[in-house]
Amino acid sequence: MTLKELQIGKSAIVDAVGGAGALRQHFLDMGLIPGAEVTLVKLAPMGDPMELRIHGYELTLRLDDAAQITVTPTEKTPAVHAPVAEKMVEHPGLGEGGKYHTKEGEHPLPEDKTLTFALAGNQNCGKTTLFNQLTGSNQHVGNFPGVTVDRKSGAIKGHPETEVTDLPGIYSMSPYSSEEIVTRQFIIGEKPTGIINIVDATNIERNLYLTMQLMELDIPMVLALNMMDEMRGNGGTVRINKMEAMLGIPVIPISAAKNDGVDELVDHAVHVAKYQERPGRMDFCSEDDHGGAVHRCIHGILHLIEDHAKAAGIPVRFAATKLVEGDPRIEEALKLDPNEKEMIEHIIVQMEQERGLDRAAAIADMRFSFIQELVAQTVVKPHESKEQLRSNRIDQFLTGKYTAIPAFIAIMGLVFFLTFNVIGLFFQNLMEMGIDALTGVVDTALTNWNVNAAVHSLVIDGIFTGVGSVLSFLPIIVVLFFFLSMLEDTGYMARVAFVMDKLLRRIGLSGRSIVPMLIGFGCTVPGVMASRTLPSDRDRKMTILLTPFMSCSAKLPIYSLFAVAFFPKYAGLVMVLLYFTGILVGVLAALLLKSTVFKGEAVPFVMELPNYRLPGLKNVAQLLWEKARDFLQRAFTVIFGATIIIWFLQNFDLRLSLTVDPQTSILARIAGDIAPLFAPLGFADWRISTALISGFMAKESVVSSLLVLFGSTAALTAALTPAQAAPLLVFCLLYTPCIAAVASVKRELGGKWAAIMVVNQCAVAWLCALLVRLVAVAVF
């Protein structure tokens, strides 16, 4: 039978994994190997995908992919909770013996050499928390060479001679996703002096799969065993010294969230890097396992490729196992001649016949077999964790068949309600009061000092009116990002992807696409960047092109201004309708793209469902500060510049003389040439055209431009009717995103796709606004 036919609550043993290429390798890397026991936990509310439990963690899989995996039903193996016969052996300090501790006669690296570290680990293992604990505020953000994946680096606190780079969260070193490719290229290409591998102690079997591949790179390495507080709290423990002896690298128990053990981790990391103490073990295949087939295969290939690996700068053990797996990138990098390729292929075929497994499955089985032996000897299994039980109870509601969709709508509705009507609104009002008070003080001072009228106008009408009106929306943006980051860090966003996968597949997307698009409600730029986690190029492009339809928070000032001014009784309803309009148009655009440019099926949905956890306040605060800082930088650079330029163009004519009549200004002349394009939409006013142009620089500047040009909200309401305001709102909702978002799309997809997106968004906005105009004329 196939995994697709397994009943809910039943278990089975995997017999064979079908499929081919990178996807099949990804299945194997995630633990779906012959001989593994899987249990079907449940199906998504819409019947697809399924949730499995394997190697102690939850994995999602579509039914179509499950149909390619053959299984044999079995009774679920009861969990064995060995009694904790001894306390966990405390980890020895430096100099107390062991391969990786201080030895006489060593030759450390020069004192002036910067110790560079790669921080690597699975997703949801606490890597970001540890990075923040290690670096504090000593962080800077860049990009990995040649790609658009963010690169966060920083010096370890108290160690200015170090630099640690936070690598993307990955499950293996196979080239399945852009994150895995980036990690591999960084470690092999930049050759850090050390690796800090963080492992989730509560999910140790899956996490150690990456550890074994990192050890094959022959780079000094320490293992940070994170969440040990949870492990102990559930009655489990780890025999640290025994694990160190079996792995040949330092193992340090830590709790990144509580900052426990981090100082010791830093001491060991600096030590192994300074003295270049490499892993004491890289060979994980036993000579006795199935006649030593895998052992002979790997060692035979090692001798054949040693010179090629050295010339290519690739660790030979890593290159050998990747060749056995069938990694095309490694094979290409080694530049083997035809005779060598034929000999290697012969060795691999011989191994497959002796082992009874194909090449990729044999390597995956070798790794998991060693992990099982390691865990059996070093880990005292805890009782079912409190975190797992809590997650199961929460999931009964949040991913339940009849409750998942209503819960999602309610949660997102609550987020927007609290953001726009309660918390965000409260702080926004405080900010506005402060800005108004400061404006009054400055205005009075300038008047008393008899400052030149032009300068007075620039400061009050230009800077304070423009930038001040935008700054007042900072609280709303920060509050919205707070809620979205909380939902993501707790693990709920992964559940949303699980619940929504079947629905999104109907419009040509994967359930994973929901996360970038939801982030797009906060800001299009991080939404576009979040698409990097999607393994399929097709899904990435579609998601990026659709994300701008999700109304970003920078447009809130526009909605708020027009909704309150023109539809005061229905302001809240108008704003909700705008958001749903953006979603509806995005769905229609997706269906069009699916049937034209991006034909084909969405990428398979293979994803881990982590336990629910409350994110650390320090991590959330760090994220919010980064978002607020980014907004403030834009407010005082792009928006500040746009405000001054618009003020200048509005107040001077072509002779550069101060103008009394705004219609004779430079701005009026430029905008007047564009205004006829908007005549069918009902707002052929040069001032509105100007504001829309400024919105391309930053959406926040639309409001500031309108207030500068019209002089006040009252003047704006006098100039427009509700039948004109409605299509204008829809146009603002859908037309091209700001230049920062366009630049993000250009970085991700190239200039061609960015230009196509700008043109398409403007065309769609114009057509939808025209439709709304026709309806509005009939209604109002």
Residue ranges and their predicted role:
Residues M1-V80:
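Compact, glycine-rich, soluble single-domain proteins
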Residues E90-S172, E190:
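Conserved G1/Walker A P-loop phosphate-binding module
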Residues H159, R184-V251, I558:
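Conserved C-terminal guanine-recognition region of P-loop GTPase G domains, centered on the G4
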Residues V222, R232-H383:
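Alpha-helical transmembrane helix bundles of large polytopic membrane transport and channel proteins
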Residues E354, A361-D365, K381, L425-I463, ...:
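Extended, low-charge hydrophobic alpha-helical regions
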Residues L398-F498:
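Core alpha-helical transmembrane segments of integral membrane proteins
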Residues M433, A437-V441, A494-T524, K599-L623, ...:
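Juxtamembrane inter-helical linkers in multi-pass membrane proteins
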Residues S553-V576, A740-G750, A769-F780:
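Transmembrane helix-loop junctions at the membrane interface of multipass transporters and ion channels
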